[in-house]
Amino acid sequence: MNRYYRFTTGLQLDLKGFIWFSMLFTFFRFLFIWWFSSQLPDGTTNFDWWLTLWYGFRLSLKTVGIIVLAGFIGATVPETIYRNWPGVRIRHWIYMAATMVFTILFFVRLSYYEIFNSSFNMMLINGMKDDWYAILMTGIHEYGLLWKLPLAILVGLGITWCCVKFVNNTTKIYRYKDRKDLCKKSLILAVLISVVAVLCRFGGALNYEKSVNWENAARLPSNLLNEAILDDAQALYRVYSIERRRQNAMKILFSREELKQKISLLGGNVNASTIDAAFSHTIKETRLAKQPNTVVMVLGESYALWPFTEKYNHPGEYLVEQGRALIASPNSMYTDVMLAQGTGTMPAVNGFLTGLVDIDVYPNYEKESYRHLYGTGIANVMKSLGYKTVFWYGGFGTWQDVRQFSLAQGFDEFYDAASLPQQGSNAWGVPDKALFDGILEYMKAHPGEKVFHFILTTSNHPPYSIDLGEAGFNPLKVKLNDMDTIERTRDTMREMGHMWYADHTMGVFVKAVEGIDANALFVITGDHAERFTFAKEVDIKTQSGIPAIFYGQGIKKEWLAPDSYGTAIQIIPTLAELVGRKGQTYESLLPSLFEPMPFAFNHRLWIDRTGLYDKQRDMPDSYKAIVSAYRDISLWRVLRGNQL
C-alpha cells in the first residue's frame, strides 16, 4: 500500500470518529434534558430543545476535535509514514477510552446536577478542600454510588463496543492517476482539514466573535438548557479556566500593615474597622433641590463613545441621536471620555456591583461575594440613600451567575428575559424594546416609590437579529462622507443599525419614564466599546472610550468640565453625590467625578491632562504607586474580606 492510500484510509477512520463523538455528545445532551425535563420552565418549546442541541453540537466540536486530533496524530500520521505502525489499534484505544470516560462522566453529571443544579462547576474546586470521607459516604448513602458506578461502567462498555463497530466500518479506496492528480487531491485535503480545524477551534465559526464557548453558551431562558449545552469536557474546562484566572490573580504578597499603608496613600481612614468604612464619604452639599424618586442607570451593551465625537459627527448625528439629545439638554452633564471597567460585559457588571477596580479576578465567582456585601457596590450605596434596588437584564440570569450575584450584592429584585415578553428574542435575550417595556410596566405598577433601576441591555450584540426595517432604521441617513475608517458594507450597516436601535429605544424609554416621573434621574453609559468593526486602525479614544451622561431636572452642565474624564466605577459616587442630601454618607473606593483625579485608569488604559495612553508601564511612578494601591486593596477586599 502506498502512503496516499494509508493516509486517506486513516482519514476516513478519523472522520468516522468525528461523526461518532458528535452523535454521542448529542445523544447524551438530549438524554440529559429529557431526564430533567420536569424542571423546564413553562413556555419551553421544541425549538428551545433544538437550539440547545445546535449550540451544544457547535460547542462540542471543540471536544470532538481534540479527541479526533489525538487519533490523527497517534495513528493516521505515523501510519502514513510507517507501513507497520499499529494505527488501527491505537485509534481504537483512544476512541474506546474517550467513550468510556465520557459515559461515566455523563452518569456523574446526572447526580451532580441533582445536587448543584449545574453541570461541573467551581464546587469541584471547593470540594477538594472538603471532607473527602464525608463526600464518599454521602455519595454511597444518598446518591447510589455503589450501584450507579457499576451501571455506568457496564453501559460504557456497551457503548464502547458500538464505537468500535461504527469506526470499524469499511472504508473507500482512493487512488490517484499521476503526480499532478496526487498534488491536486493532497491540496484539497489540506484545505478541508484546515477548515474543519478552524471550525472545531471556534465552535462552528470561523472566528472567536461568532464562536460558541463556555463563557457565552448561556443563551436560553432555562438553566437546564444552558447547562445542557456544555458537554462534560467543556464544563470541566470551565472549572479549569475560572480557577486558573483566580490563581493567577489571587496572590496577595503584602501584610495587613502594608494594606493600611496603601489605604493611607489613597486618603482612606486607617483607623476604620473595615476597608469599606475606610473610604466613607460625607455629602457636603445637596446638589438636586428635589431628590428624585426614580433613578435609572442604563448600562448599554457596546454603547461606545465614538459616535458622539466630532470626528464621527456625520454618522453619529443619526446613530446616537437620542444620546446626543440628552447631552444637548440644559439638564445634563457628561464626561469627555470615560474608561470602561474592562473589555467585556461581566467585568463592567462586577465593577458596578462591587465598586472595586478591575483585578483580573471575577468577584461573581468568589465566596466572599456571597458571604458579605460590598459597601462600595452601587446597590448598597443606593440602598444607604433610601432607594429600593432593582436589577434588569435583557439576557438570562444564569449567565455568569449574574442573578445570584446581584441579589447577593444588595439588589432587592432581579428580572431577566425569562420575566419579559419573548418578542423577537434571540440567543442572548429579548430586544431592548421588550426590556424597556417591561420596566415601564413595573414603574406604572409602583408609583411614588423610591427605586433605583440598574438596566443591562443586550441588543447591540451579535447575532444582530433585530428587524431594523420594522424598528425604523433608515441606512440612507447614516452619512459617512467618504470616511476611510468606516465602509458602507451590509455587515457594517447592520452593526450600525443595531447601534442606532439601542440608542433609539433608550431615548424612547427615557421620554416614557419622564411621562411617569418628570423628576427622574438618568445615567447612560456603556459596558465596553472595542466591538465595532472599523475598516482601519483608530485611536484609543475611538476604539475604547465609552460615554457617561447624567440627565435629569436640576443637573447643571458646569458641574463637569468639558474635558472631564474618569473611570466607570466613579459613576457610583457621582450618583450618590447627586441624589444624596447634605450630611448623608456613602462608601466609595474612588472619588466622584466632582473631585477630579490627576489621572484615571482601568485594566489597561490611563488618561491625564496630557492624553490617553495604552501602556500603563509607561505611566509616571507616582501614578503606578496609586494604581497598585487601588488594585491591592481591591484584591484584598475580594479574597480576604472587609475587616481591617
Please describe what each predicted stretch is.
Residues P86-R89, N248-E257, Y365-Y370, S588-L590:
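Short alpha-helical "patches" and their helix-cap loops
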Residues G156, C162-K172, L259-F279:
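Short, intrinsically disordered, low-complexity segments enriched in Ser/Thr and Pro
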Residues L24, K129-Y133, L230-A233, R256, ...:
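Alpha-helix initiation and N-capping motif
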Residues N2-Q247:
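Transmembrane and membrane-interface helices of multi-pass
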Residues R238-N271:
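Extracytoplasmic/periplasmic/luminal assembly and interaction segments
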Residues I73, W132-G139, Y237, L259-L266, ...:
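Generic structural signal of hydrophobic/aromatic residues within well-ordered alpha-helices
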